[in-house]
């Protein structure tokens, strides 16, 4: 049994033949996730783990591990990790500093991505496979192990569309939130979605405590389709209806991620389209400068951004500019594509064309 993949309830079921106390099972679970045990032996020999349970774990349990291939540190404190999985493929995670107090970890949910958003490097890899629960959690375990501050949040904004790996990402989030696991608050765990409407509606029905961030980028369908091909499958009216349902059921503002692209979606007509699309829906808008290493898309100039923020006042909704850090190490939104994948080496920052996406 893979100790990094089991919920507390699943662990209880797996150990039931040994008749351990609930406290003993919880101790095993906490040793893996709360305390970051490095091996089965560390778990088996943990205090308050009965000998018969420890012996059973030594004989039947495993704790696979991602291999850290590379770490890159940026001047702004962001750290990008490149992992090699024993199941195949390479994935990336980012440690994000929040002032001098804590970290948030950005994790990947898939190797590659099927959605092919035009400004996203991961989409250029194509879809390889979904990550398993343990592969998602091991990103957090290993990044946390090297952290000098507490980890207080996890965002599923790395490689892949988390709602297309629905079961595994939700299982991982539940363990992240569990008080005997990582003990991260539900509202501090966010899934970013490009707009897979059936999964969004399922998520709302099931009532999960985690937040969704909706990548809209343009409320003009023709523009959105140019950069987000999912628009052709799940068009804006369908997505906006799902966002309305999300906001109303949860009684909170929906987070609208808006990738700001110079000369593309920064005009008055773009702000007016947002107003029409989200009329009567409680939202907050996150503006994220595009970071496209190919140079095809450029971030807005300060003048463009200032003018657009003025235009957005018609929304009468909160608007914030999200800092997308780690640009020089390929850690910014949209640049996670695995430095090396299948023998192909992605350009290093010094070699890359002008930067920019999310």
Curated annotation (Swiss-Prot):
The keyword Metal-binding applies. It is found in: Cytoplasm. One of its GO terms (cellular component) is cytoplasm. Binds 1 [4Fe-4S] cluster. The cluster is coordinated with 3 cysteines and an exchangeable S-adenosyl-L-methionine. Disulfide bonds join 106-333. Pfam families: Radical_SAM. It comes from the Bacteria. [4Fe-4S] cluster binds at residues 113, 117, 120. This is Probable RNA methyltransferase MXAN_6459. S-adenosyl-L-methionine binds at residues 160-161, 192, 215-217, 289. It is an enzyme of class 2 (transferase). CDD domains: Radical_SAM (cd01335). It comes from Myxococcus xanthus (strain DK1622). Keywords: 4Fe-4S, Cytoplasm, Disulfide bond, Iron, Iron-sulfur, Metal-binding, Methyltransferase, S-adenosyl-L-methionine, Transferase. SUPFAM superfamilies: Radical SAM enzymes.
